[in-house]
Every structure is written in C-alpha cells, then in structure tokens.
Amino acid sequence: MRILKIQTLRGPNYWSIRRHKLIVMRLDLETLAETPSNEIPGFYEGLVEALPSLEGHYCSPGCHGGFLMRVREGTMMGHIVEHVALELQELAGMHVGFGRTRETATPGIYQVVIEYLNEEAGRYAGRAAVRLCQSIVDRGRYPKAELEQDIQDLKDLWRDASLGPSTEAIVKEAEKRGIPWMQLSARFLIQLGYGVNHKRMQATMTDKTGILGVELACDKEATKRILAASGVPVPRGTVINFLDDLEEAIEYVGGYPIVIKPLDGNHGRGITIDIRSWEEAEAAYEAARQVSRSIIVERYYVGRDHRVLVVDGKVVAVAERVPAHVIGNGRSTIAELIEEINQDPNRGDGHDKVLTKIELDRTSYQLLERAGYTLNSVPPKGTICYLRATANLSTGGTAVDRTDEIHPENIWLAQRVVKIIGLDIAGLDIVTTDISRPLRELDGVIVEVNAAPGFRMHVAPSQGIPRNVAGAVMDMLFPNEQSGRIPILSVTGTNGKTTTTRLLAHIYKQTGKVVGYTTTDGTYIGDYLVESGDNTGPQSAHVILQDPTVEVAVLETARGGILRSGLGFESANVGVVLNVAADHLGIGDIDTIDQLANLKSVVAESVYPDGYAVLNADDRRVAAMAEKTKANIAYFTMNPDSELVRKHIQKGGVAAVYENGYLSIVKGDWTHRIERAEQIPLTMGGRAPFMIANALAASLAAFVQNVSIEQIRAGLRTFRASVSQTPGRMNLFNLGNYHALVDYAHNPASYEAVGAFVRNWTSGQRIGVVGGPGDRRDEDFVTLGKLAAEIFDYIIVKEDDDTRGRPRGSASALITKGITQVKPDARYESILDETQAINKGLDMAPANGLVVILPESVSRAIKLIKLRGLVKEEIQQQNPSTTVIDNQNGVASSSVINTLL
C-alpha cells in the first residue's frame, strides 16, 4: 500500500458538517486492490493479536465485534486502515469514532477518512495504521514493540499539543454558549468570537487584563508593600540579593520558622516553607536562586493553604490546597504508596490532567527526614506523610472546595485586594486555620496575588463541588448573553462567486459597517486591500474573522478550499449557492456534477438554524439543497412563473424575483421592488442575465440580514462591472471604433453566459480569444471549442502560461477539435502565447467589432488593452432604447406593489 496524499480538515466539510476535525488520506492499495481480507492468509489472526480492542468496533453489522466479523468475512484494506487508525488514537487516550472509506473513480485508490482530536496525532495514526496492516499482510504480525512505540508517540503528540485544563474549561464553556473560538499561533492563545466582537485569552489572562496589574502581581515584594500600606494582612518579609544578607533577613522577620522563595516565581517553583535551621535556609536560598536573582524571606505562618479566585471583581470559587502526600496502610513502603497513587488515571504529567503525578525533589526528602522516614519506610495505617511543602497542584497537591464556607468579610477583603492590584482575574493565596472566620481573628495572611491563576482546583476538586469558574469569565467577556459573533455571509457556486461577493460587500457598506471580504483576487477590509491573490479558502477567512475592526464578513467560498481544509468558520448567518455547473471535474476525486453539488452544499448546510440558505431556484441541484439544510430557505429566480418559488412564497417564504424588468423581493402578499435591471450598471443595461441573477442573490442575502431596500438599491446603483470593482468580470472597453470585453470565463457555463451577453450587445463581428485551465478534462476543452464556435465569428485559441501538467498544445488541439465539430468551416487560428494571442485579436478588430478576451491573467489583458492608447472603460448606464431581458411594459414604478404570486 502507498499513501498518495494526506489532508487535514478543520471545519465543516464534504464528509461531515458536524465533525470538523478529519484526516483525509488518499490510499493506493496497489497489489491489494482486488484482495479482500479473508483471502490474505493469517491476516485476521494477526490483526486480532495486535489490536484485540477492535472487538469493540460495531461497524455496519451494528453489534459488538461487528467490524471483526467484516474482516473475517472479507473487507477491503482501506476500510481496515480506517478502523485501525481510529483505534490507535483511542488507545492513546483520544476518543474518536467517526470514519469513512470510499473508493475513487480510479480503481484501487481509496479515500480513507478518520476523525482526530490532535492534528499531528491524526496524521501519525493514519500512517501507523498503514504500516501495521502492511506488516500483517507481509509477516502475519505487527511487532509488539513497534505498536507500543506508536501508542507512546501518539500520547506524546496529544500531551504536547493539548490545551491546558484552564484553557480547556474556557473553551468548553464557550462551546456550550455557542461562542465560536479558534486557536491562534501560541499554544494557549485563543480567540473567542469573531471580528469586532472577539476577545482573546492566553491561559487565564484576557485582553482586558492590565499589564500594570500583571507586572505588580509578578513582583511579590512590591505587591506586599502596596497591600500592607492599604491595611491588608500580609506576611512580614524582605528581599535580599546575596547569601550574606540572609542571616540579617531572618532576624528581621522574627526568626524561624521562615519561608524562602524567588521574587518573581510561580507554580511553587523554588519555594521552601517551614524552614527551621541555618542549613535548611542556605539550601532553600540556593534553590530559589535557580529561579530568580532576588529572593524573598518571609515569616512562616501556620495554617491551611487556600486559593481564592476572583473574576471581574467577585469571588467565584475557593479551594483549600493540600500538599502532595500519601497515607500509610501499614503494609506498603512510601515509595510503593507514591507509585500506587500515581497510577490514578486522573493524574498526569504537568497540567495534562486534573491532577499531577507526584515527583520528589529536595524538599520531599527533607520532609521525610524531619518526620523520621525514608522512601523504604512503612508508615502506620492512617498516617499522613507529606511529600511537598507547598500545596500547588502542579507539584502533586490536591484540592478541596471551600466556596460555600468562606466568611463574608474574607470575600470583601479578597475583592478589595484584587481591585488594589488591578486585575480582572486573580488567584489569592491565603493562609489561615479556618477560612470561615475573618482573617484578622486568626492571624491569617494573604501570601500572594497571582495573575493567570489556574482553574484546575476549582473545576475538578478532589473533594467538594466543581465550580463553573469559566462561566464567570464568559459573563465578564460577553455580558448579557452576547455571542461574540458577527454576521458571516458565505458565497459559493460555479460561476459568479466573486462578483456576488463584491456586490454583497458593497451593499453592506451602505449600512456604514466595516465589511471584510475575500475573493479570488484578494482579501479586503473596508476599502483597502489586505492581501492580493486567490483568497477563497479558510486561511483567508481567518484573516477577516480575526480582525478586530470587521463588523461583517462576506466570504467567497471556493470548491478547492472546502476540499483541502473545510470551511474557515463553524457556521454562517447566510449561505448563498449561485449555481452548480461542470467545472473542476476530475480534480480532488470530484468526478460528477452531483458530487460537485454535494461539495458546494456544505455552504448551505453550515448555516445557523435561524439563518438563511439563499438558493437558486432555477438550478435543480441547488434548489435540492433545501432538503439538506436546517436553515431557513430563501430562493432567487429569473423566472417569475417558477412553481417552486410560488409555493415557497405561499408558505410564507421570501424570494428575490426578476419580474417585469425589475429586481424584486417577494414576501407574503407583497413585492418590494428594488430597481429596474437597466438602472443597475452591473447588468450592462439589463443585457447580462447572469449578472441580473448575481444581483438577485446579493440583494436577497442582504435583505434577510435586515439591510433595508433603500440601502440595497443604493448599493446596486453604485456598483459597476469595472476594473476597480469587478476586475475580470465583464470589463468593457471602448477603443474608438471597436470594443474589447475582458471576462474570466473558463468553463462551459460561463462561456454560455458571456455568449448570451455578446449576442445581445452587438451585431458587429465578434472575435474571441479563448482558452481554459490545463487541469480540466479533455471533454471540457472540446465543449469550450463547441461553444466558442457558436459565439464568435473568428476564434484565436491560446493556452495558459501554467498548463497545470498538461503538455503544451494539448488544450489548444482539443478546443479546435470542438470548434470544427460544430462548424467545420470556422475561421480560427492557434496562438499558444496569451500575450501574442490578445495582441492579434486587438490588431484585427474591425470597425464596430467586439474582441472578447477570456484570459488566464486578467491584469495582463487589461494592460495590453490600455497600451492601445486612449481607452475608455465603458460603464453601462440607463438607456431607454436598451432591450432588457424579459422586460415587459406597463408596470407601475412604485417600490412596493401588491403581488399575485
């Protein structure tokens, strides 16, 4: 077997709308292409020996052991690889269950789809599954050592990339509230919400957390001085920089017992408490110097260690922290008790799980020695042996919830302290013998104020009630049930995507909002180009959704991006599907128009239930998407007599209809007339029906988002098929005694659309400079030739600079084949170089003629036209003598009239 390609999906996709995290592996079975598993000697036995846990996979039989039944009876190797990849992840602690295996149009090549939690782990699992299956085919077994290494590698990948427990709690709460989130470049840096409404967090610091507060909290001594000056009970202490000053510092704080800790440490690193001798003090000083140059010496206060969490000025949780310890059973040594407690599945390395495994350090041995024990000692039953002086969870400690026990005065004091320091989220370390009584009564003290406090002890205490502290954070960042979202409008289809996206963005600008939009020619925010290029995939969508100024996102969503990575967002408010026609077939294992329709349907299916799928009622494949989506439906149609639309409106639906020469919104008993087509520059005076359809779709998408009819009308009237607003989309130039038209038509449907306009526009001679992308099918090029023969009087066949792997001259030959099939006496020539072909077309243009250029490079075509001298770009305006498609006379011009639909 051979892996041909591995792709990672991260959003709604062709395989699943709900499951975003999928690996798609293109697998060539090679010699196993026609060999089911039951025909491979020893394969079943070898697979069961390697992975007996596959017994739990149901598969199509729908019962325990169902998958292994399939293997015994005979199934193809791609299917087995799918299940093995899922099981390897499961054994590494990643609970995944979704998978699909489908044969492609190429015999023996399969697409194997597996769910993942961690991207790198998912890709590793796919490769390991192929290795495992191939090994069993070749040798009858997969070495146990290799399997163990695979599982360990997967565990390491999962641990290294997983969100920390605090971040995970925040993300889960965001998902619960329907707030979208995304992980940014740093491991714990996340974004909650989109655009102008988004917030960012790193660990438990928010973008509202003041840097002065953080800096102050990190300077333990400065914090203590400020709090002491405010009458807050804090430990007596001082800061030293040299060992020679230690003895004097001990005297200053009142003698032993003392605490020594680094000035700017965290997570308990370098801290030693309950120091009772000079030898211990020297060792503690050296340990603290490993973390910081400046050392704090404080008086040691006896009591219980409490963490009080304050969010947005309010105490939301309190936990008593208990240092790492074991409890004797009268039989086991301390070393054995530690090993036993570390087997707890809730304990992991670092912050992986709710508890951390106990690891010993210098202070551990000191504590044992002070208690008269060694690791080989057997403590009596019930005896507590402390292994750490500090109670941090990161050193193996545990937590007991005390939220309901804290005294009101202590709540007031904690909230006051956090305001003094200036933090929105803070964790206070309080030492007192009883948190239910005021600190002042028990000589309790506030030891530290921590920025970015951990949430583990509160969301998963060892004893007591788990507290939803992440909910308090969400309430602070998104008050009054705010969602953090901005309107997202996604536009897809075979043709018209860029024009419709630009028009929709232009209409939305009439509302005064900042619009971010992506197209095949670039990413834009407001009136400014952010990045040029074909930016119709998820990465470009993220640029818009991460921008803090964007209030509305209009995203052109192309086929390629959906296939490669899925959508760049979880859900949209509006999903527009313009049409589905033959293009890109045979690429990415999308071989039929129906498969292409299923791919583009992802946009319609990913709309929020309270949003709208805007669908073309005149395209049966697009109209059928209404059955797949949970969103509301809005249709647009060029046919005012559409039965589908009539029934939809009767049921209370909304539609955009081209009727009597008007673009109209129809809802219930009323028709809201927006504008006559001939008044809309984009429609070329009403002579470009495909542009009318694009305008209908954009108007309807804006309308269902509560953009007013007046604002829609203003947008339509001021948007032009020009180089500045729609480069490469029906750009018409007046070159004196002839005209040139530039359009990025590159598939049969777009050729037909351009042809309809050309026939309406001129009766003069029509010259076409035609071609197509090299990665299309042979039959597609033949079809382009046939259409060109029907449209143009003279044809110049050229090829793209980038032939996309096709031999030079091949595409041209296929196009000319199509030309001669339709018109054997057609006038044509082949000039493969695009620049030469365009110049030839312009050179031979007759008076009153039209040169139609369908280029690979729009910018090059426009530049060559402008080199011709004085060139005027024509923008079609209202023309009373213009023939409008399907125009009817005698219609009232009011914007709202009663309708009979």
Swiss-Prot record:
Keywords: ATP-binding, Ligase, Nucleotide-binding. It catalyses: [L-4-(L-arginin-2-N-yl)aspartate](n) + L-aspartate + ATP = [L-4-(L-arginin-2-N-yl)aspartate](n)-L-aspartate + ADP + phosphate + H(+); [L-4-(L-arginin-2-N-yl)aspartate](n)-L-aspartate + L-arginine + ATP = [L-4-(L-arginin-2-N-yl)aspartate](n+1) + ADP + phosphate + H(+). InterPro entries: ATP-grasp (IPR011761), ATP-grasp_RimK-type (IPR013651), Cya_phycin_syn (IPR011810), Cyanophycin_syn_N (IPR044019), Mur-like_cat_sf (IPR036565), Mur_ligase_C (IPR004101), Mur_ligase_C_dom_sf (IPR036615), Mur_ligase_cen (IPR013221). Residues 224-478 form the ATP-grasp domain. ATP binds at G493, T494, N495, G496, K497, T498, T499. PROSITE patterns: ATP_GRASP. Its EC number is 6.3.2.29, 6.3.2.30. GO terms for biological process: biosynthetic process. One of its GO terms (molecular function) is cyanophycin synthetase activity (L-arginine-adding). In the C-terminal section; belongs to the MurCDEF family. Homodimer. Catalyzes the ATP-dependent polymerization of arginine and aspartate to multi-L-arginyl-poly-L-aspartic acid (cyanophycin; a water-insoluble reserve polymer). This is Cyanophycin synthetase. It comes from Trichormus variabilis (strain ATCC 29413 / PCC 7937).
